[in-house]
C-alpha cells in the first residue's frame, strides 16, 4: 500500500521511499523507513498529502506520495 491509498487519520510505518533526489529530501525532513506517520489529509485532484511525524506536519506531493510504501500500524 502507498501513502495515497492510506485513509486519513490512519497510522502507518514507512517501508520504502522513492529512489533518488526525492528520497534524499524526505530523509532530510526525517521521513525515513521504519518511522511511524499519521496521514492527516489528501487534497483532491492530485494535490499534496499531509502527514504528521513526531508532532510535525509535512506536505508531500501526490506524485511522490504514490511511491512511499507503507504498512498500516495495526498490521505490524
How does the language model describe each region?
Residues 1-76:
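Compact, glycine-rich, soluble single-domain proteins
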